[in-house]
Amino acid sequence: MTRKWIKKLQSYIGEFFASFIFGFAVYTSIIGSAQTGQSAGPIIVALTIALSGVAIIYSFCDITVAHFNPAITFSAMCFRRLPFFGGIFIIIFQVAGFIIAGLASVAVLPGKYKNKLEIARPKRVADNVSRGRIFGTEFFLTAILVYVAFAVGVNPYTPPKDEHGDQLDPDEGLTEGRKITAPLAIGFTLGFCALLGIASSGGAFNPGIVLSPMILTGTWDFWWVYLLGQFSGGLLGGGLQRFLLYKIF
């Protein structure tokens, strides 16, 4: 096996573990908050999502794309920030990581298997929440997340340089420092987006988070609404950053 293929395999495995850790954090915080009757449940979940996201990106960004979100990966593929077939494999490993995370979460917490997965499964929070509201919530939340991910990580602005490698505008050197804080920006975005969907879709904005409990329970209510909103929202967010809001020198 060549060095190139070893690096690719390491990247796929890294994305699997990044997705597993994120999924485990999300599912256990959701289930645990519900089981213990925490009135601050949404805050607990949002903080868990934000802090785990920051830790995962810092830990895995040297060996993999550290998306742990198929909507980000799909948008990166569509806008040629990621090879198509490589992106497909990354998404497969992401979903696998979330499925194992779902199983691990129900294994470590008390209660019946399916009851715990039903708690973790994204769903409308009230009967009067329509498909359109679920779609709209997931669409806009995913668009926001993917825009930020593109701006600071997937497709960040790169200051132009002359033939000697010097930046044409010395002040642009400050831009390079944003790469260090990119995980913080993405983590904060994960956190506040998690709070914005609590009255409608529950705020998933991640196809992997949606698919795992649905696959494990066999309950597919509104699955296409969630996925359509997330993938289309991701395309909007990525497209805006790539073609409209990318800095012009």
Curated annotation (Swiss-Prot):
Its main location: membrane. Keywords: Cell membrane, Membrane, Repeat, Transmembrane, Transmembrane helix, Transport. It comes from Vairimorpha ceranae (strain BRL01) (Microsporidian parasite). Residues 33-39, 105-133, 201-223 are extracellular. PROSITE patterns: MIP (PS00221). InterPro entries: Aquaporin-like, Aquaporin_transptr, MIP, MIP_CS. Residues 1-11, 61-83, 155-179, 247-249 are cytoplasmic. GO terms for molecular function: water channel activity. The chain crosses the membrane at residues 12-32, 40-60, 84-104, 134-154, 180-200, 224-246. A motif (NPA) lies at residues 69-71. A motif (NPG) lies at residues 206-208. This is Aquaporin. Aquaporins contain two tandem repeats each containing three membrane-spanning domains and a pore-forming loop with the signature motif Asn-Pro-Ala (NPA). In microsporidia, the second signature motif differs slightly and is Asn-Pro-Gly (NPG). Belongs to the MIP/aquaporin (TC 1.A.8) family. Water channel required to facilitate the transport of water across membranes. Involved in osmotolerance. It holds the Pfam family MIP. The gene is AQP. GO terms for cellular component: plasma membrane. It is found in: Cell membrane. It is a multi-pass membrane protein.
